[in-house]
């Protein structure tokens, strides 16, 4: 059936445009003359459509293009306030903090001078002037506005064929499932063999931060490490009590005294003393998996009194609703004694838990200014009732470090590691960038973590990694020596779909791969390819040509979900799962595989007294990752993680110099880059390159660390698709310290399509590849009025076609025919 698609971005006058069509089965495609628009179309199999981009404004200003749109939306919607996150030069927050705090009705909610971070809220009517004044300060590097990032649905149910039948190609996983298995395929990164070869380097001694939707404290596989220590050592909430509209934070503004008091028409008893009181309604969690039923009794109407003793730092929750706090145990924040409360009463005779665990947390002196009115200039303490928002965080935690899944030998990647849970997601289906920024800062600077996994992100209009949050993440890595591992996003299979903040320069961004065995075991799906990328996995490069994803790891797993939810297998797999276990998919599942595997390397290095810095860890991983047959560099990055080879590189002294790269970028919006027309990798999408033509590019490389002399480097193209790229002249270059050197490379594609390769710049005297530079060119087919193609594609795969769209075209139609009955093929 013909289909007309509207543009994602406005046409750019005078520029040629390339449209990409991705299809997923045998087909014939016909295109009517199309408007100048990049088109990304979904592939067969599990996936998520890429969101429509906003119009892109200038990215040269300190307020990003997305953020300028957010400000316009706030004005149009009549929002009372806007909140901004500001990256300043480290140690230079005082000036902008004072400036914003002085705005009438404005307040500074958080500042970290060492890192260079300020979060402030100002009235929307004063936002333009406040932002303009802040942007004029040389100490201010970037400004992001608060927004909520949707949490992708990791369940594959939306992609299942209607009426599909269970095939039961594999039995259900259980207590007898071995450590090496296709259900939770940690063995594909080398994690299972590594633990077998190094049993004391199973993650012990390492603490992993999980910035997500919260981790279930009641799951049996998340109770103990392999050495019998507590698995979850801290549990906090990263959202802001006011600006994130998270009502699990209760304002302690009503003072009362024991032994008796009245609050909201109810009489209460309490031990003698001075307190503050509030109420917690289970309906506050309506947007999460609990659907507002915190105590699992089938309704959403329950309310509990909350009593706060500021002097003691304790909280009592009237769980039995007898209005007497005297029989409720005073609770401290989880890290101070690991106290857990429960909403509801469990029936041990059932598979599912009829209760939900919670913890408490206290945040002191929160500015109340965003509430306006009489609250301006005041501060208050808040108490958080810490419950999980969804299954997402628990599943991520299990993949990372579960110990004894199903009570057997099946584990997460690093079963000996400890965990810290930080909930950054709210009750409206997403996580705010404020919580994701401040939660990350809190985990790295205050919670004693050695590595952090964050499986949350979104595709911005300009995904070049040039924003305040990306800069702050890079600083956290450099300043505190903690590696951040982040999911690449689920907006594939198109190129240039990497999400933010996986764009940040020094994070490990992780794409999702899958084996033939996992397709069969977890989905009941029979495929021919032995190993491939997940169709939904976001692909590189960044808009500035940057190297993303960093690498890939398995992106589907059966693992832990909250124990108060029933088992959640894929129906077509043909088996059931017990409560507390589910099959989820996404780069959200790939990232914790990588984080857990990296934790094994940190564990081994710690035992061997090896100083494994984030830079060394990244060098070892990217230098040893395995290429996936038939997968291009822009899709897989360095390839499939291989920690056994990475460990060999670490023991051999893996190290690398630092470099900057300036390479030409020709895209529809390259004028919006930090340096218009240039980026950190070669990316030619709009340059008109044709099959059979040759085009030479100049890539400038500057070595910024190491000896103050010229050092010989070898140049080599790896994963060179179709042999499209070659080095012009010598394959060796001498790089002095801090002096740019230009290297010429040539693209000579033999056929249409996207071609990519990794230019390796390597000092042969160092262990590992020193620098990898992604090269990507797009060769489109000419289009006068129509374009037709015929072919076949394997199940759960995709086929890409690029066409040159005539200037001035207003519409694009794609007609697809020749499909088999009940085919799920789509474009």
PLM segments and residue spans:
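Autoinhibitory N-terminal propeptides
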Residues: 1-197, 778-783
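Extracellular S/T/G-rich loop segment that most often corresponds to the catalytic His/Ser-adjacent loop
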Residues: 355-373, 381, 502-595, 599
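N-terminal domain-start motif of subtilase-like serine proteases
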Residues: 56-78, 123-132, 153-210, 214-228, ...
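Subtilisin-like serine protease catalytic core
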Residues: 195-287, 291-295, 299-312, 320, ...
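A short beta-strand micro-motif common to beta-rich folds, especially ectodomain repeats
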Residues: 699, 753-765
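Secreted peptidase-domain scaffold signal
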Residues: 489, 643-747, 769-823
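Catalytic-core segments of hydrolase enzymes
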Residues: 233-241, 449-560, 623
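Hydrolase catalytic cores
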Residues: 397-400, 420-426, 450, 497-500, ...
């Amino acid at each position: 059936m013909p289909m007309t698609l509207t543009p994602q971005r406005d046409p750019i006058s005078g520029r040629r445009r390339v449209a990409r069509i991705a299809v997923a089965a045998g087909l014939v495609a016909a295109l009517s003359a199309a408007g100048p628009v990049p088109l990304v179309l979904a592939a067969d199999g599990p996936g998520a459509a890429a969101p429509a981009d906003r119009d892109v404004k200038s990215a040269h200003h300190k307020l990003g293009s997305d953020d300028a749109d957010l400000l316009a939306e706030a004005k149009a919607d009549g929002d009372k306030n806007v909140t901004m996150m500001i990256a300043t030069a480290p140690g230079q927050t005082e000036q902008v903090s004072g400036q914003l705090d002085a705005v009438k009705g404005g307040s500074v909610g958080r500042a970290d001078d060492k890192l260079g971070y300020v979060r402030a809220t100002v009235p929307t009517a004063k936002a333009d002037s406040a932002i303009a004044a802040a942007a004029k300060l040389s100490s201010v590097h970037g400004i992001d506005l608060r927004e909520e990032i949707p949490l992708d649905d990791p369940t594959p149910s939306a992609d299942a064929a209607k009426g599909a039948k269970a095939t039961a190609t594999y039995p259900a996983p259980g207590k007898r499932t071995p450590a090496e298995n296709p259900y939770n395929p940690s063995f594909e990164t080398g994690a299972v063999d590594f633990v077998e070869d190094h049993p004391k380097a199973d993650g012990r001694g390492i603490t992993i931060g999980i910035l997500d939707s919260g981790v279930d404290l009641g799951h049996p596989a998340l109770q103990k490490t392999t050495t019998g220590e507590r698995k979850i050592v801290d549990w906090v909430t990263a959202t802001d009590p006011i600006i994130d509209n998270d009502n699990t934070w209760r304002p302690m503004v009503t003072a009362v005294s024991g032994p008796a008091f009245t609050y909201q028409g109810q009489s209460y008893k309490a031990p003698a003393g001075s307190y503050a009181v509030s109420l917690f309604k289970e309906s506050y969690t309506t947007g999460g998996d609990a659907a507002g039923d915190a105590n699992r009794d089938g309704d959403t109407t329950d309310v509990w009194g909350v009593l706060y003793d500021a002097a003691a730092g304790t909280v009592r929750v009237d769980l039995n609703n007898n209005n007497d706090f005297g029989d409720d145990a005073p609770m401290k924040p989880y890290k101070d004694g690991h106290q857990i409360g429960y909403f509801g009463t469990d029936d041990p005779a059932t598979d599912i838990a009829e209760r939900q665990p919670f913890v408490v947390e206290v945040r002191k002196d929160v500015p109340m200014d965003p509430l306006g009115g009489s609250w301006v200039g005041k501060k208050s303490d808040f108490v958080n009732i810490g419950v999980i928002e969804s299954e997402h965080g628990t599943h991520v935690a299990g993949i990372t470090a579960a110990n004894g899944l199903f009570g057997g030998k099946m584990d997460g990647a690093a079963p000996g590691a400890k965990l810290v849970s930080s909930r950054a997601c709210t009750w409206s289906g997403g996580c705010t960038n404020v919580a994701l920024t401040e939660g990350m800062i809190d985990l790295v600077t205050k919670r004693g973590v050695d590595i952090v996994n964050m499986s949350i992100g979104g595709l911005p209009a300009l995904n070049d990694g040039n924003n305040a949050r990306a800069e702050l993440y890079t600083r956290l890595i450099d300043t505190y020596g903690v590696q951040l591992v982040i999911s690449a996003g689920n907006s594939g299979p198109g190129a240039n779909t990497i999400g933010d903040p996986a764009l940040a320069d020094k994070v490990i961004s992780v794409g999702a791969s899958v084996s033939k065995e996992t397709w069969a075991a977890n989905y009941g799906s029979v495929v021919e390819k032995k190993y491939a990328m997940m169709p939904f996995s976001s692909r590189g490069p960044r808009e500035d040509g940057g190297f993303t994803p960093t690498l890939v790891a398995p992106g589907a797993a059966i693992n832990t979900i909250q124990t108060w939810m029933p088992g959640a297998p894929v129906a077509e797999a043909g088996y059931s799962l017990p409560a507390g276990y589910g099959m989820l998919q996404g780069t959200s599942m790939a990232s914790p595989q990588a984080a857990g595997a990296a934790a094994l390397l940190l564990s081994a290095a710690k035992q061997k007294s090896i100083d494994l810095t984030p830079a060394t860890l990244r060098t070892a991983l990217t230098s040893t990752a395995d290429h996936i047959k038939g997968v291009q560099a822009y899709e897989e990055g360095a390839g499939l993680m291989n920690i056994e080879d990475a460990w060999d590189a670490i023991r051999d002294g893996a190290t690398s110099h630092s470099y900057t790269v300036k390479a030409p970028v020709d895209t529809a919006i390259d004028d919006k880059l930090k340096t218009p027309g240039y980026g950190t990798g070669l990316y030619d999408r709009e340059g008109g390159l044709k099959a059979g033509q040759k085009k030479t590019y100049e890539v400038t490389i500057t070595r910024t660390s190491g000896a103050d002399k010229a050092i010989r480097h070898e140049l080599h193209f790896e994963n060179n698709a179709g042999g499209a790229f070659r080095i012009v002249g010598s394959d060796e270059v001498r790089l002095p310290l801090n002096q740019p050197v230009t290297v010429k490379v040539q693209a000579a594609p033999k056929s249409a399509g996207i071609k990519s390769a990794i230019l390796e710049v390597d000092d042969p005297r160092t262990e590992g590849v020193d620098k990898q530079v992604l090269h990507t060119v797009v060769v489109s087919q000419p289009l006068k009025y129509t374009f037709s193609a015929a072919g076949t594609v394997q199940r759960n795969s995709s086929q890409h076609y690029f066409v040159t769209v005539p200037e001035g075209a207003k519409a694009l139609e794609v007609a697809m025919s020749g499909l088999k009955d009940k085919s799920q093929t789509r474009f």
